[in-house]
From Swiss-Prot:
Keyword tRNA-binding: yes
UniProt-listed NCBIfam families: ThiI_C_thiazole (TIGR04271), tRNA uracil 4-sulfurtransferase ThiI (TIGR00342)
Molecular function per GO: ATP binding; CCA tRNA nucleotidyltransferase activity; tRNA binding; tRNA-uracil-4 sulfurtransferase activity
Catalytic activity: [ThiI sulfur-carrier protein]-S-sulfanyl-L-cysteine + a uridine in tRNA + 2 reduced [2Fe-2S]-[ferredoxin] + ATP + H(+) = [ThiI sulfur-carrier protein]-L-cysteine + a 4-thiouridine in tRNA + 2 oxidized [2Fe-2S]-[ferredoxin] + AMP + diphosphate; [ThiS sulfur-carrier protein]-C-terminal Gly-Gly-AMP + S-sulfanyl-L-cysteinyl-[cysteine desulfurase] + AH2 = [ThiS sulfur-carrier protein]-C-terminal-Gly-aminoethanethioate + L-cysteinyl-[cysteine desulfurase] + A + AMP + 2 H(+)
Top enzyme category: transferase
Pathway(s): Cofactor biosynthesis; thiamine diphosphate biosynthesis
Sequence similarity: Belongs to the ThiI family.
Protein name from the UniProt record: tRNA sulfurtransferase
Pfam name, any one: THUMP
Keyword annotations: ATP-binding, Cytoplasm, Disulfide bond, Nucleotide-binding, Redox-active center, RNA-binding, Thiamine biosynthesis, Transferase, tRNA-binding
Gene behind the chain: thiI
Length: 482
C-alpha cells in the first residue's frame, strides 16, 4: 500500500523557507494522526510530496480517510511503486498491470517525469502507449476523451503507476496559521465557519455559551469533538464552556425588549474577548451571515464589533443558508445541527434591525457587569480529547457490555452512510437503526419494557447519547462495546 500526497499548490508559491516549514508541519500532522489510528504505516517527506506506505492493506480505509480529511493536501495518489531499468522495462510493467483494463477500450498514456533520464515525458508516453496498442489487439489509442487514461510518473529511478486519484481537502496544514476561538452553538453556521478555518490552517478552539443546560452542552461538545476528530486531531485544542444563563437573566430584567438581541451578542463578544485574551488568541470566529437574523444587519454588526479588541472573522458573511447547509452536509455536521435547539432568538420579541449606539449604551448602563465577569471566571475549560473520557466519567452509571442479554435490542446509532457502508448484523439479536440525531425524538416511542444497547464505531457517541437519555429519565440504556 502506497500513497503519494500532493500538498496544496499555494504552499509552493511561498518562499523556500516557508515552503519547507509548511511541508514539514504537514508531514508531522499526517504522522501524528496515522500513529494514533494505525500501526506500521510509514510517512516520508520527499520535498515536493509526502509518501505514506505500509507492507499490507490492513489500514487502507483508515489511511485514505486521514489523507483526504487533513488540511493542506490537494490530492492523494494511490500508486504501485517499483524500480525500473529502461523504457522497455517500464512498458512491460505497465502492460502487466493495465492489460485487462484496456481490453476492448480506447486508452491514452499520460506520463510525468522528474530526474535525469535518457528519454522525455512525450517519448515515454509514445513508447508505452505504442507497446500497449500492439500487445492488446482489442484496445486502441484515443488521445482525446478515451475510455481509460493510464497515468504514470517516473521520479529518478522509481516508477509510479497511478491506481486511483483522490481529492484532498485543500487549504493549509493545521498549525501554519495563528489560533482562533470559535463561538460554537452546534448549529449549521458555527460548525461550517469552524471547519473553514481549520481547513485554512488554524487551530480552532471552541467557546460555548450555554443557554440550555446540560443537554445543550452535550450536543455542542459532540459537534466540536466531531470537527476536531475528523479534520484537526493532530492539534491540541480547548473547549471552553461558559454558563450564560445568569447573563441572560440580567438582560431580561434590565434591558428593553427591542435591544435584547444586540445586547446579548455584545455580551457574547465581550466574554469571548476575555477568554481569547486569557489564551493569547487574537481572533474570534462566528457563523454570522449578513441579514440572516435581526442582529446581523450591518449596523448591528458594527455595534457588536466595537465591544472587543479581538479581530472578529465571519467567513459566512455573504453565504446563503442553503449554501451553508450543503457544506454542513458535505463535512458531516448537518445531522448534529438538525436537532440542535436555538436559544438566542427567544429572548427578544421585537428586535431592532438598526440599533442606536446611545440607546444601547443607556440600556447596558443598567446591566451589572460583575455578572459577566463572574461567568467568565467560572468558565470550564477542557482538552477536547477529554470529551470522550468525560462522557464516561460524567455518567458512571451507564453500563458498557460486550455480551448481549436475552431480549435486549441493539440500537445502531451511526449515521445512515456509516450503517450502509458496514451494516451491523448479529445472529439471534434484534438490531434497530436509529441515527443519533433522531434518538432524542424517537427513543420514547420504543417499547420501554426492553433494554437497549447503544452502538457506534468508537463508543464515544453511544456514551454521550446514553448520558443524554438517562438525563431524560430513561434508565433502560447501556452501551454495547463488542
Amino acid at each position: 500500500m502506497k500513497f503519494i500526497v500532493k500538498p496544496h499548490p499555494e504552499i509552493f508559491v511561498k518562499s523556500e523557507s516557508v515552503r519547507k516549514r509548511f511541508t514539514k508541519i504537514l508531514e508531522s500532522n499526517i504522522r501524528i494522526i496515522i500513529q494514533n489510528r494505525t500501526e506500521s504505516v510509514a510517512v516520508f517527506n520527499r520535498r515536493d510530496h509526502i509518501e505514506v506506505s505500509a507492507n499490507s492493506h490492513q489500514y487502507y480505509q483508515q489511511v485514505l480517510e486521514i489523507l483526504t480529511t487533513t488540511p493542506g493536501i490537494q490530492q492523494v495518489l494511490e500508486v504501485k511503486q517499483s524500480d525500473f531499468k529502461d523504457l522497455h522495462d517500464i512498458y512491460e510493467q505497465v502492460l502487466e498491470l493495465s492489460r485487462e483494463r484496456i481490453e476492448n477500450k480506447t486508452f491514452v498514456v499520460r506520463a510525468k517525469r522528474r530526474g535525469k533520464h535518457d528519454f522525455t515525458s512525450i517519448e515515454l508516453e509514445r513508447y508505452v502507449g505504442g507497446g500497449l496498442n500492439q500487445s492488446v489487439e482489442s484496445a486502441s489509442v484515443k488521445l482525446h476523451n478515451p475510455d481509460i487514461t493510464i497515468k504514470i510518473e517516473v521520479v529518478d529511478d522509481k516508477l509510479n503507476q497511478i491506481l486511483a486519484h483522490h481529492k484532498g481537502l485543500g487549504g493549509f496544514p493545521l498549525g501554519t496559521q495563528e489560533d482562533l476561538l470559535s463561538l460554537i452553538s452546534g448549529g449549521f453556521d458555527s460548525g461550517v465557519s469552524s471547519y473553514l478555518h481549520i481547513k485554512r490552517g488554524s487551530k480552532v478552539h471552541y467557546c460555548f455559551f450555554n443557554l440550555g443546560g446540560p443537554a445543550h452542552e452535550i450536543g455542542v461538545k459532540q459537534v466540536a469533538h466531531f470537527l476536531w476528530n475528523k479534520y484537526g486531531s493532530s492539534a491540541k485544542v480547548r473547549f471552553i464552556s461558559v454558563d450564560f444563563e445568569p447573563v441572560v437573566a440580567e438582560i431580561l430584567e434590565k434591558v428593553e425588549d427591542g435591544q435584547m438581541g444586540v445586547v446579548l451578542k455584545r455580551m457574547f463578544m465581550r466574554a469571548a474577548g476575555m477568554v481569547a485574551e486569557k489564551f493569547d488568541i487574537q481572533a474570534l470566529v462566528t457563523g454570522e451571515a449578513l441579514g440572516q437574523v435581526s442582529s446581523q444587519t450591518l449596523t448591528n454588526l458594527r455595534h457588536i464589533d466595537v465591544v472587543t479588541d479581538r479581530l472578529i472573522l465571519r467567513p459566512l458573511i455573504n453565504w446563503d443558508k442553503d449554501e451553508i447547509i450543503k457544506v454542513a452536509r458535505d463535512i458531516g455536521t448537518e445531522d448534529f445541527a438538525k436537532t440542535m435547539p436555538e436559544y438566542c432568538g427567544v429572548i427578544s420579541k421585537k428586535p431592532t434591525v438598526k440599533a442606536v449606539k446611545e440607546k444601547l449604551e443607556a440600556e447596558e448602563a443598567n446591566f451589572n457587569f460583575d455578572i459577566l465577569e463572574q461567568v467568565v471566571r467560572n468558565a470550564r475549560q477542557m482538552d477536547i480529547r477529554d470529551i470522550a473520557k468525560e462522557s464516561a466519567q460524567a455518567a458512571p452509571e451507564v453500563e458498557q457490555v460486550q455480551a448481549i442479554e436475552e431480549h435486549a435490542v441493539v440500537l445502531d446509532i451511526r449515521s445512515p452512510d456509516e450503517e450502509d457502508d458496514s451494516p451491523l448484523e448479529i445472529d439471534g439479536v434484534e438490531v434497530k437503526h436509529i441515527p443519533f440525531y433522531k434518538l432524542s425524538t424517537q427513543f420514547g416511542d420504543l417499547d420501554q419494557s426492553k433494554t437497549y444497547l447503544l452502538y457506534c464505531a468508537r463508543g464515544v457517541m453511544s456514551r454521550l447519547q446514553a448520558l443524554y437519555l438517562q438525563e431524560q429519565g430513561f434508565n433502560n440504556v447501556k452501551v454495547y462495546r463488542p
